Amino acid sequence: MKNKKTRRFKIRYIVFGLLCVMALAALVFMRFGGFGTGENVNPEEFLAYAEPVENITVPESAKIIALGEATHGNAEFQQLKLEVFKLMVKNNGVRAFALEGDYGGCEQVNRYIHGGEGTAQEAAAAIGFSIYRTEEMAELISYMRQYNESALEGEDLRFYGFDMQRLSYSMRFLKESCKELEVDTTNLQKLVEGENWSSECDLSTRTETLTQVKKELESKNGSENAIHFVDILMQHSELQTLTNADGATLRDQFMAENVQWILQQEQRNGHENIFVTGHNSHVAKWGSSDSMGKLLSKDAANGYYVIGTDFYKTHCNMPTRSPEKRTIQVFYSHDPLAKAAKLAGFDICWLDFTKVPENSELGRQASEYTYMGTLGESYSIIMRLLPPSYRMFQPPAVLYDSMIFVTDANPTKILEE
């Protein structure tokens, strides 16, 4: 009898021990996205080719210079927007900054940096996405305003948006332009209720009204910017009728068209190139779907050059399912290049793939399919169980011309409106 009880206790201890081991393994897996932080290339070889960010150079032929961000919720990736843009202004004659942000909201920023009222923080909030309500974006906007205070005529910096996911500012500025150009806005007024489309007007009604306004504007001199507001509103209107999957593809197509429009505006003003920045998934020049970058890179006349980014480890500021609440979550990219940057002692560095020999270990790894981090504006506990949901599996040197690696990325702090 005693032996039976002893055996039962032993079995219970064994089962309990196995459950503890399984629970610990699950916690490790959920923390690191695997049973460790991934593989890495030779840190010494990486060290031989990696350079500081201030060494970034792009070909003279580059007309659209793009900077990606692996996440929307890290301070370093927002700081890089300013740091790299300054280099492009100084070394490449760039005068246009184009953001993955609402076109109308970014026009409000553009007016601010040209002497408009308000504060840099208020200007950043006008962009329309909470991810840009940060001190990092306010610092970028302040730099552009300060630069313009002493800029020569025609050499001022300009702030553009190439997204179309907001309505209010584009509609407001379109109405202002119509009033200045003596174009009737009676029917335009009927299209909106507050900051949204009127429920009484369907897609065909909106399209018909906006098309008529555009036709009238085309007969007026100096109406090009106003016409683009119409185009943005038509894009926004069409996107509202599509599912997420179809809408994402169309959004990238629209963003590519808008970037080309921005480039054309700058070239008419005597500037041959522009700087654009958005999520890696939009600026990458290759992928399974037609991203903005892929579409732009197909046309050699664009001279598309893209700098991707990645992290080794991130504390990322992300929204929960409740729009008002955000959370800071830790992720590891499992990118062997980012891990090599960490082991080589870098906090941040730049790697130009054109300088890395193709037959080297580093060159082969950069050209092979590998994991990289990619986090957007959403978080779910499922991401802990499915690491591919926050990683992409692509060849870095095919997606980008060069990359910046941030080894330990810190969260942004979203400012109150």
Language model features by range: what are they?
Residues 2-417:
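Structured catalytic-domain cores with a bias toward divalent-metal coordination
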